[in-house]
């Protein structure tokens, strides 16, 4: 790969960080030039070619920007949200007090700032709060921006170093900002669609099919929205998202949420003929009612992204094979690689009434399961007001019958998917049982006490319990003390000791194989090779232009007092 076009040495870098600035024009010029130095010559050629510009000072047209970002048709709100975000970022580091149209320089800064690795290199700091910058860019609207006053333009007394400029966020107080919940919902929906459509930095984009499923992805996006603010259960327009809610949710339970946006922005560095086809998981999940593209996208925000590089293998679908332990065992137990168990159903809101009047089998289940008292439960608004309940369990070990002992390694975890997202990790090995003598399935439980005339479940402090007929399930969360820790989100919010229990009537149970380590390693190598091959073609294409200096000058890469960088 061609080297960066930067010509500054480490000594020069150090001296520039200590340099002081007194006006906005010099600050913007410094960061614009620094942005250009961060990219390679092939990347810069592709960038200018995609936008059809010769000079980085050229404003980018709205049409060119929309075409490059593959926005869904008839979704004006997401177009406005994202283009506004880019306008704010393009004026970095003066997001509040300076406003200019998006130029080539500005868009180049957007790409760097939205990429975690590039951002750290661009700003020469690994501790920079990238989430705060993104939140500011989403919450500052065009009408909020302040025009530079004559006083601020001529304020030569205030001297700022690079570090002060970067860490000051242009004096924007995030405590005073919020993002309307309906705006955030649109943004999250778009990100989930990108998770499916844009899995790599160099994948061809053809998002017509997934854009047609906007409504399905919106349902999953609502789960993520309620993860940020659990009070969003009714009128979305009356709610908003604070920076604390935004940052906490992403850092704890959806760390991969922004990766697709990174991938999309990196597409500016590839010409169309350098992109490659990438097979998605969509073909393997066509027959599923639960493992939809939208749910798969949501899962990938919190689980290791490597799990979703290869196609998922359908092992057991209850609606097809029947809801029974025997059917599940016959379909799943020969799979020797990691798997994901997904269960979905409707929460039983009034247990006593439902047991007495609607389902005598549930009354029998309550006699065997020690239910928490209603007075002891502390549910948030999302659990109280939303009945749809979905959980996934990632299981690294092969399944096996365990009527007395347990299986499952330290990678086992329960993921709450709906009505909000949280992740519950094990703190010891051996947390799962598959009991074929009437005990059902338990994650985080003790083995049930089974006698000829009675049965007693022993739920763990954090646990997911299935009855032996796969008709009922219970998720319990009463804090520390069990083989699973409280949810990552709950612990971050200091809510781990707020007990609650979700009883639900199972509507779907599915098990999906994730592929073995060998297959995963091969597919990761294939993706890395494809990306390297795309970059190699970039260099070859650029070399073919090398004989025509006029073309390079037109691209702004040589001449015009530039060294041209290194190939």
Curated annotation (Swiss-Prot):
Alphabetical list of InterPro entries matching this protein: TLDc_dom
GO cellular component: cytoplasm; nucleus
Compartmental location: Cytoplasm
Domain TLDc, residue spans: 289-515
Coiled-coil boundaries: none
Keyword terms of this UniProt record: Cytoplasm
GO BP annotation list: response to oxidative stress
Functional description taken from the UniProt entry: May be involved in a process influencing telomere capping.
Family named by the database record: Belongs to the RTC5 family.
Record protein name field: Restriction of telomere capping protein 5
Species whose genome carries this gene: Saccharomyces cerevisiae (strain YJM789)
The encoding gene: RTC5
């Amino acid at each position: 790969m061609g080297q960066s076009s930067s010509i500054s040495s480490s000594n020069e870098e150090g001296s520039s960080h200590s340099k002081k600035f007194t006006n906005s024009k010099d600050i913007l010029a410094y960061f614009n030039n620094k942005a250009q130095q961060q990219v390679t010559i092939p990347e810069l050629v592709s960038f200018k070619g995609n936008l059809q510009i010769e000079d980085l000072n050229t404003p980018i047209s709205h049409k060119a920007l929309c075409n490059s970002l593959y926005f869904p048709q008839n979704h004006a709100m997401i177009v406005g949200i994202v283009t506004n975000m880019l306008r704010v970022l393009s004026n970095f580091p003066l997001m509040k007090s300076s406003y200019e149209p998006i130029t080539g320089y500005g868009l180049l800064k957007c790409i760097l700032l939205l990429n975690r690795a590039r951002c750290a290199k661009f700003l020469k700091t690994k501790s920079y709060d990238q989430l705060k910058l993104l939140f500011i860019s989403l919450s500052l609207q065009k009408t909020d921006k302040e025009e530079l006053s004559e006083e601020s333009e001529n304020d030569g007394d205030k001297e700022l170093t690079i570090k002060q400029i970067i860490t000051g966020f242009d004096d924007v107080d995030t405590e005073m900002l919020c993002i309307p919940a309906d705006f955030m919902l649109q943004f999250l929906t778009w990100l989930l669609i990108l998770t499916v459509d844009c899995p790599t930095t160099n994948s061809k984009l053809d998002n017509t099919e997934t854009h047609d499923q906007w409504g399905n992805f919106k349902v999953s996006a609502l789960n993520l929205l309620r993860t940020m603010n659990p009070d969003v259960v009714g009128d979305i327009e009356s709610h908003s998202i604070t920076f604390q809610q935004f940052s906490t949710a992403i850092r704890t339970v959806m760390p991969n949420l922004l990766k697709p946006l990174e991938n999309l922005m990196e597409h500016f560095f590839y010409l169309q003929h350098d992109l490659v086809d990438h097979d998605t998981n969509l073909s393997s999940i066509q027959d599923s009612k639960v493992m939809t593209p939208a749910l798969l996208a949501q899962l990938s925000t919190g689980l290791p992204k490597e799990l979703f590089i290869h196609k998922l293998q359908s092992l057991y679908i209850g609606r097809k094979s029947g809801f029974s332990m025997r059917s599940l065992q016959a379909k799943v137990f020969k799979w020797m690689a990691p798997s994901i168990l997904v269960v979905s159903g409707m929460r039983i809101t009034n247990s006593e009434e439902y047991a007495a009047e609607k389902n005598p089998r549930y009354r029998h289940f309550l006699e065997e399961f020690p239910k928490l008292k209603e007075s002891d439960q502390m549910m948030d608004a999302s659990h109280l007001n939303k009945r749809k309940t979905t959980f996934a369990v990632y299981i690294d070990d092969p399944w096996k019958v365990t009527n007395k002992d347990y299986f499952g390694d330290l990678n086992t975890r329960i993921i709450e998917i709906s009505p909000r997202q949280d992740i519950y990790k094990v703190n010891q090995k051996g947390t799962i049982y598959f009991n074929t003598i009437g005990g059902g399935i338990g994650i985080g439980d003790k083995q049930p006490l089974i006698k000829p005339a009675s049965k007693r479940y022993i739920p763990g402090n954090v646990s997911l319990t299935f009855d032996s007929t796969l008709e009922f399930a219970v998720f319990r969360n009463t804090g520390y003390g069990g083989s699973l820790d409280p949810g990552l989100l709950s612990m971050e919010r200091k809510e781990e000791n707020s007990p609650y229990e979700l009883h639900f009537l199972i509507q779907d149970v599915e098990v999906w194989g994730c592929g073995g380590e060998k297959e995963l390693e091969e597919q990761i190598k294939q993706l890395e090779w494809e990306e390297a091959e795309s970059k190699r073609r970039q260099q070859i294409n650029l070399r073919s232009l090398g004989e025509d200096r006029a073309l390079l000058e037109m691209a702004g890469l040589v001449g015009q007092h530039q060294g041209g960088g290194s190939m």
